Amino acid sequence: MNSNGLKICPECGGKKEVLIEIFGIKRKVPCLCRCESAERDRLRKIEEQEQRMHKLENLRKYSLMGKRFRECTFENFEIDDKNKEMHRLGTRYCENWQEIRKENAGLLLYGPPGVGKTFLAFCIANRLLDNMIPVIAISSIGLLGKIKESYNYWGNEGEIEIISSLKNASLLVLDDLGAENNTTWAKEKIYEIIDSRCSDKKPCIITTNLTREGLKEKLTGDDGIARIYDRITEMCCPVAVAGGSRRADIARTKEKIIRKMMMK
């Protein structure tokens, strides 16, 4: 105790009691010393981190993202002269997310297979997820497959639930658009999804192996919906992705590994 009869922490020397006056009567009131306050802050940070990790786990669970795409991160982005502008585009998109979200500014990444469109789109998705922003990232084939599968379990209510989850996501990444079956049903569902995002002013990132004209023809052909491509171009800035094939580079690397093993 100090000279006022108040408890003192033997560890930090800080007060464990303070003297206050209420209606003319002085009373001793417990308080946290410096080390107790530090311990409280430490436990609070641990709790906040656990809550953050739990929320992130849930966001990833409901992102519909396949496990193999979780490795698509800017930290794993191998920058070269061919793709440095795409890396810059992706990181700037994430850094300016609040403005992007406000302006409903999406991306239409188009180009030949293997040049990194999907990788870039999922890098953006993972970075935003890390920042606790709800994202759904899935291929058009995978999404339509989930809708069809839901009919077997919940009928039309399953489709409503999936469409609702898409509406709730701050960003929708729709990968490989144009690879889905060329049916009226598929085009109607794609239009419904795109139109809903457009109406709610929520951005999309769309990737396709088709040219812009090829995508337009695929979506708005004889049995298509004329407005669907207009909705996409209204929401998404078209970006041509060029460069060497990442898949070919990966294949060559694996080939070298196998050859090296065989030579031992």
Please report, for each region that a protein language model flagged, where it lies by residue.
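Walker A/P-loop nucleotide-binding motif
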Residues: 101-121
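N-terminal pre-Walker A segment at the start of P-loop NTPase domains
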Residues: 75-100
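P-loop NTPase Walker A phosphate-binding motif
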Residues: 119-131
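Conserved alpha-helical scaffold flanking the Walker A/P-loop in AAA+ ATPase domains
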Residues: 95-98, 150-172, 188-196
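Interdomain "pre-motor" coupling segment immediately N-terminal to P-loop NTPase/helicase cores
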Residues: 19-65
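Short glycine-rich substrate-engagement loop in P-loop NTPases that contacts/grips substrate
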Residues: 86-87, 129-168, 181
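Loop/turn-to-beta-strand initiation segments
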Residues: 133-134, 168-171, 200-206
